[in-house]
């Protein structure tokens, strides 16, 4: 009986007096738990500071995340059903199974867990704009949480002087993308404090959402105007937080930077990354011909200030590449643009810029390479090609070194006296020495000519012919007596032409006046017809003497191998019939006729 009483009334769990009607007692307690939790969920949505449950412990505070509040409320609303499952059949009619649970203690435990979750929510997660008035102690933390974790720098959180670097960045926010597109944080020079509009944009985080939306739109309208003079406006594709002047762009080189305009003064920091950044700015501005004339003095000043500021000289080499562009803005824009982009089309750009500066035709024997070194506009005409008209310009692409040297020499000359200065004997002699040091050999230069111009081919050296005859005589000694030796005995087969019957190649003979340095004294080749040239090319294509000689050597080697194998086979057959006396002692088990491989 005692066990039944304890089971029905729950004396072991509740210290109170057992009720006479246990069904009514438990159903009332479950209904109280339901009403209790519904009251808690209603109180959680109201902005009340705290709620007391039965005088035990306070629940949660009002500023909590709305998403997590609903989730927690739904969990608490579902918890009593899991603890006390009371279907309608068991409430009204049916058997009753006593539930050994303490609803009051369970509610207290849930309230404690709820408070811990709310504290973790306010400290770890990002503050939403839909919340009301926030505490003043948590404002710096929420401002630091405004940036993504991977973009937060220590300079962003602690800035004692309140100054920012000289760049404008776009702060991407989830809420600002939906409302007003982009929210720009304005940044002035490194010596100026934070502007009023930026301060208002920072204070807008602690206000209600409507005021923040209105002020955010005004700040975006103020910053979307034209940039002022003396500023570099850099728009970064990823979020780049504002920082001190010593941070600059060097610590985050992975962010792609797009320069929109640059008429600025010297940069505020002295790091090499800023120098390279200004180098790209100078290059982009100088490539635009409309901005080139206006920003030339400023670019020159900027280059001078950068030379003074950069101590290590890491980026001076790249900045010097843009120096001729700033110097030649008034002389010619086309020359600067073609020199910057590609060196291959420099001759065409010179032809377009100076069409009226053309001198009479200069005769050139080896395709006029010396005349082109003197001036790219001088017309050249080959004496062997009579089909070309005097108006044609025979110009060949020069190597990169000769073009750079030519541009350096032509840079100091004006358009009026460049040809007169180059026509002096001193200048032409210098050019001849330069060509002798840097030009390829004669046969290489001749191959660059056009198909209409005859091609000079190197004549076979008599030393090579002597080596061929010696090698053939040496190989004939090793050949067996066969038809191959008879074929090689005819030495005339190895020479395509008999001795003295080779066509005249017409090598150029230098004149005596070329030593004096006159521009007209150019080497002239001896006159010869095109038939001889094409006959020589045909002879070169059809001459397969080396190939035939190689095949003969291979065949002779194979013949020697076959003959030696045949001799060994004959010797083996002869030895097989004989019996050697010294093999019978150690090899008595071997049958007659089977011998070891050493006897072969």
Swiss-Prot record:
The keyword Disulfide bond does not apply. One of its GO terms (molecular function) is damaged DNA binding. Meiotic recombination factor component of recombination bridges involved in meiotic double-strand break repair. Modulates the localization of recombinases DMC1:RAD51 to meiotic double-strand break (DSB) sites through the interaction with and stabilization of the BRCA2:HSF2BP complex during meiotic recombination. Indispensable for the DSB repair, homologous synapsis, and crossover formation that are needed for progression past metaphase I, is essential for spermatogenesis and male fertility. It comes from Mus musculus (Mouse). Disruption phenotype: Male mutants are infertile. They have smaller-than-normal testes with reduced diameters of seminiferous tubules and sperm density. Female mutants exhibit normal fertility with no apparent defect in adult ovaries. They show a strong reduction of the follicle pool. This is Break repair meiotic recombinase recruitment factor 1. Residues 143-154, 199-215, 330-344 have a biased composition (Basic and acidic residues). The gene is Brme1. Signal peptide: none annotated.
